[in-house]
Amino acid sequence: MGSLPSRRKSLPSPSLSSSVQGQGPVTMEAERSKATAVALGSFPAGGPAELSLRLGEPLTIVSEDGDWWTVLSEVSGREYNIPSVHVAKVSHGWLYEGLSREKAEELLLLPGNPGGAFLIRESQTRRGSYSLSVRLSRPASWDRIRHYRIHCLDNGWLYISPRLTFPSLQALVDHYSELADDICCLLKEPCVLQRAGPLPGKDIPLPVTVQRTPLNWKELDSSLLFSEAATGEESLLSEGLRESLSFYISLNDEAVSLDDA
C-alpha cells in the first residue's frame, strides 16, 4: 500500500491532534477557551416568530455546562444559552465534531458554497473515525453531496483509497486539494460559514390582508352582479368569480327543480 505525500505546504495548526497533524497534541489554553463552532439549525429565542440563530452561523463557545452551552454569535455579537445538540465544534475550518451526515449535507448546500466545498466530520458512533463530505456541482442538475469514509490503519495512517495512505488528515486534505484521485472533484475550500445576511424571522414580509367589503351582500340585487353593464373595472366581481357564481347558482336552480318534480 503506497503513500503519496502532498506537494502543498501545510498551514501551521498547533492545536490539532495527532490524527490531524501527524504529531502529538499540544496543550494551548487560549485555543481551548475560545473554541469555534457552528449552529446546526435555527434556534428560537424571545418569541415564537423570532429566531436568534440560523443554520451555518459561526459561533464562539464561551462555556460548556453539560447539555447546555453558552455561545457567542459572530454575526450578531449576542450571547445565547442553547442545547449542545444544536452546535458542532469546528477546528481549522474543515474538521467538525458532533456533526451528522444529514447536517453536513445541509451546511454544504447553503448559498456561498461552490462545487468542491468540503468538510471532514468525526463519526458520532465510531470514535476516532472520520468521513469526508464534498459538494459536487452538476451544471445540468442539482448539486449533490458525496461522502467518503476515511479508514485508519493499525499504524495510524489514513486512507480513502487503499492505494494512497496519509500520515494525517491535513496531509489527506492537501493531497486531494491538488489531485482528485478516486473522489468526485478537487477539494477547493472548506465549507463556508454564514457570516452575513438577515437572520430568519427578522425580515419576513408583512402578511397579505384582505379588507372586508362594505357591501351588504344580503341586500344586493344579484341581477346587478351578472348584468352586461356590470363588467369591466366598475364591476363588483372579477370575470372568473362571476362565472363561478353563475355556475353555482345554476346548479342550485337545477337541484330545486328536481326537488319540485
UniProtKB/Swiss-Prot annotation:
Cross-referenced Pfam families: SH2, SH3_1
Question: PROSITE patterns annotated for this entry?
Answer: SH2, SH3
Lipidation residue positions, type N-myristoyl glycine: 2
Report the locations given in the UniProt record.
Answer: Cytoplasm
What is the superkingdom listed in this entry's lineage? Eukaryota
User: Any keyword Transcription?
Assistant: no
Sorted alphabetically, the Gene Ontology BP terms of this entry are:
antigen receptor-mediated signaling pathway; B cell mediated immunity; negative regulation of calcium-mediated signaling; negative regulation of T cell receptor signaling pathway; negative regulation of transcription by RNA polymerase II; regulation of immune response; T cell activation
Cellular component per GO? cytoplasm; cytosol; endosome membrane; Golgi apparatus; intracellular membrane-bounded organelle; late endosome; nucleoplasm; plasma membrane
Residue span(s) of domain SH3: 32-92
According to the UniProt record, where is the region SLA C-terminal? 195-261
List all Basic residues biased stretches: 1-10
Residue segments, region Disordered: 1-31
Domain remark in the UniProt entry: The loss of the C-terminal domain partially abolishes the inhibitory function, but can be partially compensated by higher level of protein expression.
What quaternary arrangement does the UniProt entry report?
Interacts (via SH2 domain) with ZAP70 (phosphorylated) and CD3Z (phosphorylated). Interacts (via SH2 domain) with CSF1R (phosphorylated). Interacts (via its C-terminal domain) with CBL (phosphorylated).
The protein's job, in short, is: Adapter protein, which negatively regulates T-cell receptor (TCR) signaling. Inhibits T-cell antigen-receptor induced activation of nuclear factor of activated T-cells. May act by linking signaling proteins such as ZAP70 with CBL, leading to a CBL dependent degradation of signaling proteins.
- This chain belongs to the protein called Src-like-adapter 2
Species of provenance: Homo sapiens
Q: Which gene encodes it?
A: SLA2
